């Protein structure tokens, strides 16, 4: 267990350094309280924090520096000593006052409750004190008092639910008893903090239809999240993940990018926590962590599932949002329970924490039930469909982009349009049809409050595996399927050899190589597959793979932050092109063009690019479509391509409406 000591300019800090290093066997890190920002500290490698003694008062920024943010934000074990102890009490709402008399280099016996950091410590042990201030003898909403002197001066405190402890005395003093034992207890508390998050899993060796499996889980909990390998391909999409939330640890993170507000809510609770910070900084500091379980054949071992919306470009690329999204800009659910299905081996894994096992019996009973699926029977007339930008406006935008390319403002712009469907659509039923009619390797169904997200994406944005290898699979270049095998082969060859398609793909590949180069080891960024053709029900597409080895000191959240939004949905150069997109498009993209996936406790992650996705609200649904515009683009062909892509997503509605073959999209004709 590696400790970080925040030095409040005290003369005894390196006595603490020696004591902690001796007990833990690992040399601690030491930084001054004004040496680094909180965000910079998050990039350091440490397991717990010791806030040192020091002169002054915790309410003064010059005395306490970054320690306040550590106390208020960090989700790791914290031990405050003397000034650090007072800061913990003060920033949880307590009063720090002058002591009856200053105590410097003086000794006292301590009486304690034998719990937490005092576990196994004899009572009336002798400590050395150096303080003029003291915490009031009063318990707070979140803080309890664990130890006092015989005359009632507070000597030890702890948080009621978090691993945060304070000691008024100096355990590192040569004349203090039990210093090593106290530090050993804190190290054990740190170890328990990480160990309590250990994974428990059970394997059911049985084939399941994952569609039927989700129907059962949805009946059990209609908030169940589904990362669905609806198109199974070895090495790409072998596992499907079903995420659920328990009351003990389940929580939801929503983020408002324009106001930089992170909101954390809890399962079956009115409790809410609000943080005024960037979502990426929040996750670096607060996401749960655990070791990778090598016995499992997949990377997701509990963690966050959800989306990051396109408008997060304000944080990642410093591009002001011209339009604001009406739903959260990021929405993550912490899934402390999950089912993972191995499509290759025909095995179902039930995952949870070791202290949360009872729910699995409910699931196993559920799996033994016969599922009855009630499909929508009544067919009705096709609803009104409308492009936000009609053909005339969209093609005019393409001409504007070409002028900007000629002027040297950009190389390539991913221009998008939005198809609005004006009808009440059942989100789950729509997704079940979508995965059947138009499957994708990186599909998902996320029922999130008023918004249901049904995605059949076949494009991977980012994957980080257990070896810190990052990979991305941009798609650029699309052509329709042929009527015959011979025509199909001809179209594939046309796609491979067309100069425009190759240009589109190369620009994005080089952009993503650049993005990965920001945090990968020198020489490790490679392109193992360049412009492979992948075939789907309605079209062929060109797909490239780019990969690299992440530097040891880079957190996976930084990987996401430094590559978002995905280059295949922006164009290049990225920042200038994002500004151009905001001038041309008249609405926020929201979830579309963002990313859906997971951040696992074990520091792996896997995210798609949000394409082929319906965003379903109460009385309408929207489908985003788009394409890369370069100088070689033909306006008519580009518009035909987005109509083709839209119809791929509309296939899911085929079972519910009459006259499907006569679909008329308002705005799709001159």
List where the protein language model places each region.
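Extreme N-terminal starter segment of soluble prokaryotic enzymes
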Residues: 1-4
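Active-site flanking residues adjacent to catalytic metal/cofactor-binding acidic residues
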Residues: 6-7, 169, 227, 509
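Cysteine-nucleophile active-site neighborhood
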Residues: 43-120, 124, 183
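Extended alpha-helical targeting/anchoring segments
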Residues: 195-670
């Amino acid at each position: 267990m590696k400790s970080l000591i925040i030095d409040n300019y005290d003369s005894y800090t390196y006595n603490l350094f020696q004591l902690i290093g001796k007990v833990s066997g690992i040399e601690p890190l030491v930084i001054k309280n004004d040496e680094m920002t909180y965000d910079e500290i998050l990039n350091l490698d440490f397991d717990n924090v010791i806030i040192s003694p020091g002169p002054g008062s915790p309410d003064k920024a010059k005395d306490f520096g970054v320690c306040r943010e550590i106390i208020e934000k960090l989700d790791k074990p914290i031990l405050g000593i003397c000034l650090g102890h007072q800061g913990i009490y003060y920033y949880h709402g307590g009063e720090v006052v002058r002591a009856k008399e200053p105590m410097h280099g003086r000794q006292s016996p301590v009486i304690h409750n034998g719990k937490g950091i005092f576990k196994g410590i004899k009572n009336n042990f002798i400590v050395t004190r150096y303080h003029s201030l003291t915490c009031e003898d009063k318990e707070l909403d979140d803080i309890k008092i664990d130890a006092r002197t015989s005359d009632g001066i507070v000597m030890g405190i702890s948080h009621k639910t978090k691993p945060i402890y304070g000691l008024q005395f100096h355990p590192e003093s040569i004349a203090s008893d039990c210093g090593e034992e106290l530090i050993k207890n804190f190290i054990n508390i740190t170890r328990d903090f990480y160990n309590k998050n250990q994974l428990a899993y059970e394997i059911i060796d049985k084939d399941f239809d994952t569609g039927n499996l989700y129907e059962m889980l949805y009946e059990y909990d209609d908030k169940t999240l589904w990362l669905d390998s609806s198109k199974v391909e070895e090495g790409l999409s072998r596992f499907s993940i079903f995420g659920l939330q328990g009351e003990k640890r389940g929580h939801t993170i929503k983020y408002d990018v324009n106001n930089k507000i992170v909101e954390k809510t809890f399962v079956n609770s009115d409790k809410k926590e609000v943080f005024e910070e960037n979502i990426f900084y929040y996750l670096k500091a607060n996401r749960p962590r655990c070791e990778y379980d090598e016995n499992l054949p997949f990377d997701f071992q509990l963690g966050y599932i959800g989306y990051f919306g396109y408008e997060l470009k304000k944080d990642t690329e410093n591009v002001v949002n011209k339009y604001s999204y009406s739903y959260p800009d990021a929405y993550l659910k912490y899934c402390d329970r999950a089912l993972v299905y191995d499509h290759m081996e025909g095995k179902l894994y039930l995952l949870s924490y070791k202290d949360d096992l009872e729910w699995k019996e409910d699931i196993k009973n559920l799996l033994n039930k016969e599922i009855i699926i009630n499909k929508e029977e009544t067919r009705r007339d096709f609803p009104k469909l409308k492009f936000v930008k009609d053909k005339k406006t969209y093609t005019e935008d393409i001409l504007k982009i070409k002028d900007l390319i000629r002027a040297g403002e950009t190389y390539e712009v991913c221009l998008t349009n939005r198809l609005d469907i004006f009808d009440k659509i059942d989100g789950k039923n729509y997704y079940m049809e979508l995965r059947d009619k138009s499957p994708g390797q990186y599909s998902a169904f996320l029922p999130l409050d008023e918004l249901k997200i049904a995605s059949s994406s076949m494009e991977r944005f980012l994957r980080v595996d257990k070896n810190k290898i990052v990979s991305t699979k941009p798609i650029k270049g699309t052509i329709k399927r042929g009527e015959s095998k011979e025509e199909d082969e001809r179209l594939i060859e046309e796609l491979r050899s067309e100069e425009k398609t190759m240009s589109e793909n190369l620009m994005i590949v080089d952009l993503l190589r650049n993005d990965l180069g920001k945090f990968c080891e020198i020489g490790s960024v490679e392109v193992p597959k360049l412009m492979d053709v992948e075939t789907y029900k309605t079209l062929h597409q060109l797909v490239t793979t780019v990969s690299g080895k992440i530097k040891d000191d880079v957190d996976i959240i930084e990987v996401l932050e430094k590559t978002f939004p995905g280059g295949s949905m922006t164009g290049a150069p990225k920042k200038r092109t994002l500004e151009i997109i905001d001038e041309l498009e008249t609405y926020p993209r929201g979830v579309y063009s963002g990313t859906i996936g997971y951040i696992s406790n074990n520091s792996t992650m896997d995210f798609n690019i949000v394409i082929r996705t319906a965003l379903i609200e109460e009385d309408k649904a929207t489908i985003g479509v788009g394409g890369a515009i370069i100088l070689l683009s033909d306006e008519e062909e580009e518009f035909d391509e987005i109509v083709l892509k839209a119809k791929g997503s509309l296939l899911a509605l085929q079972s519910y409406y009459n006259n499907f073959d006569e679909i008329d999209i308002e705005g799709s004709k001159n």
